UniProtKB/Swiss-Prot annotation:
GO terms for molecular function: exodeoxyribonuclease VII activity. Heterooligomer composed of large and small subunits. Bidirectionally degrades single-stranded DNA into large acid-insoluble oligonucleotides, which are then degraded further into small acid-soluble oligonucleotides. HAMAP family: Exonuc_7_S (MF_00337). The gene is xseB. GO terms for biological process: DNA catabolic process. Keywords: Cytoplasm, Exonuclease, Hydrolase, Nuclease. It is found in: Cytoplasm. It comes from Geotalea uraniireducens (strain Rf4). Its main location: cytoplasm. This is Exodeoxyribonuclease 7 small subunit.
Length: 76
């Protein structure tokens, strides 16, 4: 299975949402689209969580140098 990119999954999710919001799909097709949307949303969420863990902030020190600090959310 090929590795999917976040941007590709997000585009697929947006397409699914557009189809579902159109309200023209038969029930069975709506269910299939919904399942695909859930799959794409979970993938995007996972990728965002992974990216968040990798974010680092560069903070300028008083001496002009930079120090790395791991990104932390306030609720952690």
């Amino acid at each position: 299975m090929a590795v999917e990119k976040f941007e590709t999954a997000l585009k697929k999710l947006e397409e699914v949402v557009k189809k579902l919001e159109g309200g023209e799909l038969p029930l069975e097709d709506s269910l299939k689209a919904f399942e695909e949307g859930v799959k794409q949303a979970a993938f995007c969420s996972k990728k965002l969580n992974e990216a968040e863990k990798r974010v680092e902030l560069l903070l300028k020190q008083k001496d002009g140098s930079f120090a790395r600090e791991e990104f932390r959310l306030d609720d952690e």
